[in-house]
Amino acid sequence: MIKRRKTREITLGTLKIGGNNPIVVQSMTSTKTHDIEATISQIDRLIKAGCEAIRVAVPAKEDAEALKEIVKYSEVPIIADIHFVPYMAFLSMEAGAHGIRINPGNINKKEIVRDIVLEAKKRNICVRLGVNSGSLEKHLLEKYGYPSAEALAESALNWSEFFESLGFYNFKVSIKGSDVIQNALANEIFAEKTDTPLHIGITEAGMGTQGIVKSSVGLGILLYKGIGDTIRVSLTDEPEKEVEVAYEILKSLGLKKKGIDIVSCPTCGRIEVNLPNVVKQVQEALKDKDLSIKVAIMGCAVNAIGEASHADVGLACMKGGALLFKNGKILKKVTEENMVSELLETIEKYYQEV
């Protein structure tokens, strides 16, 4: 079992982060925030996918003004993403945002950062303090020669100390880079020196297989070491996909349970059925079910039940049908035409029993 890093508890709206609380899955809308209808529609889809906190871009006044309606509507906390125009932070807080994300490295004056922090403190609004290689302070670049892991961690520690010197502790830190190893090292250095909660992710991970693999490895390294209080999988894809992948990463490490865990074999020359099609049918039928159960779908009967003994229910396929099993014991043989429906019925019964 993974022992998570002990961090202080902070509050984002009604959501508790850090401490002994579960890891929070976040994502970000890809709509123009001032398009309230489109933004709310995407928020609905994200919530349905299991997203627990949602960030929206606020580059202009019309976006900040739209937050009033969006915050009122959303069932989960809304975080305003602020870059380069610090005035938007004040407008977003006034509009009711539960949290704001700022990157002090792209705010010209420390006094402005101070004013934002003091306003957040007054309103009890959570702040995400962002540090990345593209906005590292000049003196740190001169000291280290490039945006090294040490430079990123030092920047985050310096700004954290500044926030705390103002008596403000309701913040988390994100240290992000597109390089997996640098990203991991920077977060590890920071985590060793403070109890501030960490938001983790790999920025600019990419799309498709590349993005998923990069995020899975980068997040997996940190999560295995107990680091991470909130996470986002950044993909060039629909935001709902980010949430899906985030849950799969957490489930694979035993850090979160959501939905059914379907395992299937990679197939070989012994296969007698269209296994990918069977798996897709089962996934589609169960995608909206909030059940905590492991299902195995194996391509043949050779060692299938033994290999999948850890599963609660499953199929060991063979020519013309499959063996349906539960808790490692064969229940019956089913035909190829009925094996998916029989499996789904068994899953439903299993869930009622537990």
Curated annotation (Swiss-Prot):
Cofactor binding description: Binds 1 [4Fe-4S] cluster.
Catalytic reaction(s) noted: (2E)-4-hydroxy-3-methylbut-2-enyl diphosphate + oxidized [flavodoxin] + H2O + 2 H(+) = 2-C-methyl-D-erythritol 2,4-cyclic diphosphate + reduced [flavodoxin]
Gene3D superfamilies: Dihydropteroate synthase-like, Sulfite Reductase Hemoprotein, domain 1
Cofactor: [4Fe-4S] cluster
One of the record's GO molecular function terms: 4-hydroxy-3-methylbut-2-en-1-yl diphosphate synthase activity (ferredoxin)
Binding-site residues for [4Fe-4S] cluster, renumbered to this chain: C265, C268, C300, E307
EC number in record: 1.17.7.3
GO biological process, one term: terpenoid biosynthetic process
Key word Iron present: yes
Lineage: superkingdom: Bacteria
InterPro entries hit by this protein: Dihydropteroate_synth-like_sf, IspG_bac, IspG_bac-typ, NO2/SO3_Rdtase_4Fe4S_sf
SUPFAM superfamilies for the chain: FMN-linked oxidoreductases (SSF51395), Nitrite and sulphite reductase 4Fe-4S domain-like (SSF56014)
Sorted UniProt keywords: 4Fe-4S, Iron, Iron-sulfur, Isoprene biosynthesis, Metal-binding, Oxidoreductase
Involved pathway(s): Isoprenoid biosynthesis; isopentenyl diphosphate biosynthesis via DXP pathway; isopentenyl diphosphate from 1-deoxy-D-xylulose 5-phosphate: step 5/6
The family this protein is said to belong to: Belongs to the IspG family.
Described purpose of this protein according to its UniProt entry: Converts 2C-methyl-D-erythritol 2,4-cyclodiphosphate (ME-2,4cPP) into 1-hydroxy-2-methyl-2-(E)-butenyl 4-diphosphate.
Protein known as: 4-hydroxy-3-methylbut-2-en-1-yl diphosphate synthase (flavodoxin)
Originating organism: Hydrogenobaculum sp. (strain Y04AAS1)
